[in-house]
Design a protein with these regions (language model features):
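Structured loop/turn residues at secondary-structure junctions
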Residues: 20-21, 118
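Short N-terminal binding/cap micro-motifs at the start of the first secondary-structure element
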Residues: 23-28
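Conserved beta-strand elements of the Class I
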Residues: 16-18
């Protein structure tokens, strides 16, 4: 693939994550990318903008509950992509999608726009622009409603709830003063977690705040799988209750799809067929009330190694082989692996060294 501008020097597969804001989301994804791609020889994955935390802010103490977060200081010097320092102008959220489109034309292989519902005026236009396929590429969107903090919340529990805001507060002389709900600092105005996400999080001891110079990634880095499963479950429930565009829904998030893309995991809803085509293979699986349905789609036989299909129990942190012997399917042949999953179980399929597919149970809505 031809590369132009700053990206001519790239020989790796380049992913850029264009974020709303310069703290919460860039901090989260920068830390995630550092952990999973810090020494990668094949991928160049970074956020735009890079976290812009003043040195004095990064050195200040910040209470975030029962964990120590990672503080990021502004970097000076060194080689950086021009794009990382460029100010993105325009009307949100369309401006982030347009920028993600622009950098793909300059050699970026895959781009994502990460933003919240908020009160942005151009949601419909942003979604339409993202879905345009130009030169074989589209812009991927990682969207949250009410906000990114709802995605974080799903790492601690499953909740389908319509919050009014991330933080309760009021504007005084043009500046928002937050009530810090859940701390009893403003008892007359404290929503007790009924209206704002951070108030709910404080009440339940998940975190104290989310808008400082400290990354939220340490909060959930050991719960990423739980967050992915709960987010997929949330979309299933949302789809069962409304057919409105996602930018009109509350709650909603698909940030987990981006996270899964980065950590090599993909969730598949109950009853949905997943097809794998790679390395000469072509087969499909679907989970239903009888168990795991497996079909060989190619014109020759397919071998499935013992233990390729596992039942993983998240609560017990245990795995059990679903296929206790090697499976051989002729062309067009199907097989059924009987199983019934609880809410805490998923079927894990390691389709390659880099990727794991997770088939979810039939959650009660």
């Amino acid at each position: 693939m031809a590369r132009t501008s700053e990206n001519k020097r790239h020989s790796k597969y380049v992913i850029r994550i264009v974020c709303e804001g310069d703290k919460t989301k860039p901090l989260f994804f920068t830390d995630l990318c550092d952990q999973f791609y810090g020494d990668s020889k094949d991928f160049d994955v970074r956020t735009i903008p890079q976290p812009n935390i003043p040195v004095e802010d990064a050195e200040a103490d910040s209470s975030r509950g029962s964990y120590k977060g990672k503080k990021r200081k502004v970097k000076s010097g060194g080689q950086k992509d021009v794009a990382e320092d460029e100010v993105i102008t325009g009307v949100p959220p369309l401006k982030w999608v347009l920028y993600a489109r622009k950098i793909m034309s300059e050699g970026v292989d895959e781009s994502w726009a990460v933003y919240d519902k908020d009160e942005h005026p151009k949601h419909e236009e942003a979604m339409a622009e993202a879905n345009k396929i130009i030169d074989g590429k589209k812009v991927n969107i990682a969207f949250s409603s009410r906000s990114f903090e709802y995605y974080l919340l799903l790492h601690f529990e499953y909740l389908y709830y319509n919050f009014d805001a991330t933080e309760c507060g009021e504007r005084i002389k043009g500046k928002k003063q937050i009530y810090e709900c859940g701390t009893s600092k403003n008892p007359d105005k404290d929503c007790d977690g009924k209206k704002c996400i951070n108030g709910y999080a404080r009440k339940h001891g998940y975190w104290m705040e989310s808008k400082s110079s400290v990354s939220t990634f340490p909060l959930v880095k050991d719960k990423l799988l739980k967050g992915m499963i709960n987010a997929c479950r949330l979309r299933t429930e949302s789809d069962s209750k409304t057919d409105e565009p996602i930018y009109k829904r509350n709650p909603y998030t698909n940030v987990d799809i981006l996270v899964g893309r980065l950590i090599g995991k993909e969730t598949v809803n109950y009853g949905t067929t997943y097809t794998f085509r790679d390395h000469g293979s072509d087969w499909s699986v679907r989970l239903d009330e009888k168990g795991l349905n497996l079909t060989n789609n190619k014109n020759s036989s397919e071998i499935f190694q013992r233990g390729m299909f596992m039942i993983y129990d998240r609560e017990k942190n245990s795995k059990k082989e679903l296929n206790e012997k090697v499976l051989l399917l002729d062309s067009g042949e199907s097989d059924l692996l009987p199983c019934t999953l609880t809410d805490s179980q998923v079927i894990s399929i390691k389709v390659s060294h880099e990727k794991e597919v997770l088939l979810l149970p039939n959650f009660i809505i």
